[in-house]
């Protein structure tokens, strides 16, 4: 394992497998002989160094948005579309989806395989950790600051709900919302699926939740839906009397939790679901590791 970073991090240590490993300068690193290279340092770093690593023979798994929407680069959730991994050799780069997309795809794919999904309406309740470590530190300070909220302090995470994640685009939707649209279509392999998203930041440290309504081509009864989800990989299904919560199930867990499943009262072909997952683990780090494991096990 070679932990890479900028010169600012030289001399620091990271812990792996009960060992301390010193950080290495990314600019001077030789990627020859490296099997896998994981990029999580932002799109600019991935843009500059991922091709260098890929050209040296490393399989690059990129956790940024830099390569997600390029046609010749696979965008992978292993439980959903691992068969697409065979195309990674086009450029030796694989894209890891956005955190909110990953848990959505894990939950919806079993239904989509049985009866194709025509439309998805989603409202996300995304934790502050999705904005980075400094955002969590700001939330913690705001929660104990007696002078909060100060008028000049932004963002106002504590005791607040913020209906904007990412820059607002020309169509009025935020970048986070459009990521859900673009990535869902690519992962499920259908441009015909209609996706309507609202992404919201909530004062939770870790764990994204999503309220989702889907319309399928056929009328599916609840027993069938629950049976499909209960047999699907990486899903823990909750019964009618209980439901997943971010504070209990969205932190330190590897599964995607699904509950509050019910038929839409206004449309017989529509279903409502509540989906919770750890955005740092399944929403990022774990999914990228699963991609590497799938390549190793499948001998692509």
What function would you assign to each model-found segment?
Residues 37, 128-300:
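Charged docking surfaces used in two-component/phosphorelay signaling
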């Amino acid at each position: 394992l070679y932990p890479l970073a900028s010169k600012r991090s030289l001399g620091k240590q990271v812990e792996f497998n009960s060992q301390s490993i010193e950080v290495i300068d990314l600019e001077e690193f030789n990627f020859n002989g490296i099997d896998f290279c994981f990029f999580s340092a932002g799109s600019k770093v991935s843009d500059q160094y991922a091709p260098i690593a890929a050209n040296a023979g490393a399989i690059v798994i990129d956790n940024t948005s830099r390569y997600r929407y390029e046609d010749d680069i696979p965008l992978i959730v292993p439980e959903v579309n691992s068969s697409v991994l065979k195309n990674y050799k086009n450029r030796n780069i694989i894209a890891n989806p956005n955190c909110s997309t990953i848990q959505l795809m894990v939950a919806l794919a079993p239904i989509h395989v049985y009866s194709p999904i025509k439309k998805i309406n989603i409202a996300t309740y995304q934790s502050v950790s999705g904005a980075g470590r400094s955002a969590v530190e700001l939330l913690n300070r705001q929660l104990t600051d007696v002078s909060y909220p100060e008028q000049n302090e932004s963002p106002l995470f504590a005791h607040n709900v913020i209906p904007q994640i990412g820059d607002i685009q020309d169509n009025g939707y935020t970048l986070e919302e459009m990521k859900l649209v673009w990535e869902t279509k690519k992962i499920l392999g259908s441009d015909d699926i209609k996706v309507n998203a609202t992404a919201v930041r909530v004062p939770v440290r870790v764990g994204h939740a999503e309220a989702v309504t889907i319309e399928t081509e056929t009328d599916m009864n609840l027993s069938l839906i629950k049976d499909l989800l209960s047999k699907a990989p990486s899903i823990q299904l909750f019964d009618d009397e209980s439901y997943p919560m971010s504070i209990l199930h969205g932190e330190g867990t590897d599964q995607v939790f699904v509950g509050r499943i019910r038929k839409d009262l206004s449309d017989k072909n529509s279903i409502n679901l509540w989906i919770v997952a750890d955005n740092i683990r399944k929403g990022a780090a774990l999914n990228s590791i699963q991609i590497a494991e799938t390549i190793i096990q499948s001998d692509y």
